Amino acid sequence: VMSDLDFERKHAEDLQRLRGLRLLDDDFMNKVFEDKACAEFLLQIILQRTDLRVQRAHGQHDIKNLQGRSVRLDILAVDEADRVYNIEVQRSDKGAGVKRARYNSSLIDANVTEPGDEYEKLNETYVIFITEHDVLGDGHPIYHIDRTVRETGALFGDESHILYVNAQIKDDTALGQLMHDFSCTSAEEMHYQILADRVRYFKEDTEGVATMCKVMEDMRNEAAREA
């Protein structure tokens, strides 16, 4: 049983860790963007679509693969046109490999269709990796990956999209300012009010801080169980 002293120490460590968390840290990002308005704002900037309206957003969404093993997505959101968005943040390049993007994309396809459904009913999907480093390595702020017909260069049109957003580029564009915000530890330094308010809530508000401490405690317990 954890002693009071031990609990105090762990709690102090959590508070210290919370101060250093950024939107590039998945356990923090999950909480911020499970808020529908924040998820909508994020997608509007990344996809340059001000008309995009999010119906629902879930943080840490568990999705089963065909073997029944559970895979946890950072954020899963659905818009009013039933387009499905998976948003992942990755600090290590290892977790953001191209096969991982393909895997997430196929998982979503397998999970949103019911057996016997028409294939035509497959939702349009976006798998979006926001990476701390320029994983694809060509210096672009954003990379759009779509299947194309090699002979004609035309889009294949299967409505499956993969995007990589490079958080290294923090210029004065809307996306660059968003990436700046993803790299901040304090709400004060952030450009976008909607994100700053939510970050401030989890870092400075008593209730928000308690929520985040609970998240960190749950993660510790889960790690201990899996060890």
Regions found by a protein language model. Give the residues of each.
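Short, charged alpha-helical interaction segments and adjacent helix-coil junctions
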Residues: 2-19, 23, 27, 46, ...
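Acidic-basic catalytic patches of nuclease active cores, encompassing PD-(D/E)XK
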Residues: 22-56
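Short secondary-structure capping/turn segments at boundaries of alpha-helices and beta-strands
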Residues: 28-29, 42, 60-64, 72-75
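Short, well-ordered alpha-helical segments
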Residues: 32, 36-41, 99, 193, ...
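A short acidic/basic microdomain associated with nuclease active sites
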Residues: 52-66
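Exposed, low-complexity/repetitive linear segments and helix-based recognition motifs
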Residues: 59, 71, 143, 214-215, ...
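Zn2+-dependent peptidoglycan hydrolase active-site motif and core
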Residues: 64-72, 76-205
